[in-house]
Amino acid sequence: MAQAGRTGYDNREIVMKYIHYKLSQRGYEWDAGDADAAPLGAAPTPGIFSFQPESNPMPAVHRDMAARTSPLRPLVATAGPALSPVPPVVHLTLRRAGDDFSRRYRRDFAEMSSQLHLTPFTARGRFATVVEELFRDGVNWGRIVAFFEFGGVMCVESVNREMSPLVDNIALWMTEYLNRHLHTWIQDNGGWDAFVELYGPSMRPLFDFSWLSLKTLLSLALVGACITLGAYLGHK
């Protein structure tokens, strides 16, 4: 596989294609085409997601509120070094790892979805609370996969609740967090190429916490309890 160099791959492309995949698993279509419809590295354009079946669009005031009511700062697109195109094997390996994660905890994820209580006013706060707990004790590949899968759950739940414009925001928040908080760790640990080598066809186990209920951990995180979810989410 071609090495991406120090700058790495485009996190936005990875996020967009992962979300597209998770939504397609539930029968939601993305009519805007490929994730590269907007320039690489740019913030997602409002309204680029379109779903079937069609639902009533969220009022503009709610879309704005979803972006403003959050402890996370908005992502500002800045010029930087050119990022390498993401090899298909990276997307494929991440999808397989996410599917493995969701299969192991299918019932827990289903129950967690019902507990999210997503609204345009609470979505970003929910995202921030869970992600901060997830990485409280540091970063590893298992936690990164859990991060992607949680983002996918939020996107699916948003569409299920007829709040599909939230998907644009969730994609932005995921990209923002990857760029600001996870990118350096990923590059220092061999980049996404290392992830593929470690967890590709052989699928080295990422998740070794079957004795602990994911539902319990994520439910506690959702209400802001000070637990360390990340400590149980795999190993480097």
Curated annotation (Swiss-Prot):
Segments carrying motif BH3: 90-104
Tissues expressed in: Expressed in a variety of tissues.
Residues carrying Phosphothreonine: 69
Sequence motif: BH1, positions: 133-152
Topology term for the membrane: Single-pass membrane protein
One example GO MF annotation: ubiquitin protein ligase binding
Transmembrane segment boundaries: 209-230
Modified positions (Phosphoserine) in chain numbering: 70, 84
Pfam families referenced in this protein's UniProt entry, alphabetically: Bcl-2, BH4
Any Gene Ontology CC annotation: mitochondrion
PROSITE patterns xrefs: BCL2_FAMILY, BH1, BH2, BH3, BH4_1, BH4_2
Summary of the knockout phenotype: In response to intraperitoneal injection of muramyl dipeptide (MDP), knockout animals show lower serum IL1B levels than wild type. Mutant macrophages release 30% less IL1B than the wild-type cells.
Span(s) of short sequence motif BH4: 10-30
PTM annotation: Phosphorylation/dephosphorylation on Ser-70 regulates anti-apoptotic activity. Growth factor-stimulated phosphorylation on Ser-70 by PKC is required for the anti-apoptosis activity and occurs during the G2/M phase of the cell cycle. In the absence of growth factors, BCL2 appears to be phosphorylated by other protein kinases such as ERKs and stress-activated kinases. Phosphorylated by MAPK8/JNK1 at Thr-69, Ser-70 and Ser-84, which stimulates starvation-induced autophagy. Dephosphorylated by protein phosphatase 2A (PP2A). Proteolytically cleaved by caspases during apoptosis. The cleaved protein, lacking the BH4 motif, has pro-apoptotic activity, causes the release of cytochrome c into the cytosol promoting further caspase activity.
UniProt site positions, description: Cleavage: 34-35
Any GO BP annotation: retinal cell programmed cell death
Annotated keywords: Apoptosis, Autophagy, Cytoplasm, Endoplasmic reticulum, Membrane, Mitochondrion, Mitochondrion outer membrane, Nucleus, Phosphoprotein, Transmembrane, Transmembrane helix, Ubl conjugation
BH2 (motif): residue ranges: 184-199
Record NCBIfam families: bcl-2
Family: Belongs to the Bcl-2 family.
Record remark: domains: The BH4 motif is required for anti-apoptotic activity and for interaction with RAF1 and EGLN3.
Function of the molecule: Suppresses apoptosis in a variety of cell systems including factor-dependent lymphohematopoietic and neural cells. Regulates cell death by controlling the mitochondrial membrane permeability. Appears to function in a feedback loop system with caspases. Inhibits caspase activity either by preventing the release of cytochrome c from the mitochondria and/or by binding to the apoptosis-activating factor (APAF-1). Also acts as an inhibitor of autophagy: interacts with BECN1 and AMBRA1 during non-starvation conditions and inhibits their autophagy function.
Subunit-structure text: Forms homodimers, and heterodimers with BAX, BAD, BAK and Bcl-X(L). Heterodimerization with BAX requires intact BH1 and BH2 motifs, and is necessary for anti-apoptotic activity. Component of the complex, at least composed of LRPPRC, BECN1 and BCL2; the interactions prevent BECN1 from forming an autophagy-inducing complex with PIK3C3. Also interacts with APAF1, BBC3, BCL2L1, BNIPL, MRPL41 and TP53BP2. Binding to FKBP8 seems to target BCL2 to the mitochondria and probably interferes with the binding of BCL2 to its targets. Interacts with BAG1 in an ATP-dependent manner.
Entry protein name: Apoptosis regulator Bcl-2
Source organism per UniProt: Mus musculus (Mouse)
